[in-house]
């Protein structure tokens, strides 16, 4: 049996996942993080993107995160996010429309603030589309 640890993924609205996992992959403020059993304690910010969960028996699940906090303790990992959406619950048409609008805003931005905001929105839309793609492949 593979080594595991307990993972909780919680949004402001609900608990998205709670159970034993082999590993997770998430984008932290300093880059990609792979959290395996026995990982050193850690507290870091999470960038908008996804958390890839490899469950106890090897099944994979993808959840979109709007950003948040990752806490790693010896036997428990907690992901806290303002918004967390399961891959199968994401709306591809809305994500594509958000991507198109963000690209338009980038082309028509007037100043650093406009560009930074549009760039952040584009990153979120691309992350949602990536979660949708990976969720389809995993099914």
Swiss-Prot record:
The keyword Kinase does not apply. Gene3D superfamilies: ATP synthase delta/epsilon subunit, C-terminal domain, F0F1 ATP synthase delta/epsilon subunit, N-terminal. GO terms for molecular function: ATP binding; proton-transporting ATP synthase activity, rotational mechanism. It is a peripheral membrane protein. It comes from the Bacteria. Its main location: membrane. One of its GO terms (cellular component) is proton-transporting ATP synthase complex. F-type ATPases have 2 components, CF(1) - the catalytic core - and CF(0) - the membrane proton channel. CF(1) has five subunits: alpha(3), beta(3), gamma(1), delta(1), epsilon(1). CF(0) has three main subunits: a, b and c. Belongs to the ATPase epsilon chain family. This is ATP synthase epsilon chain.
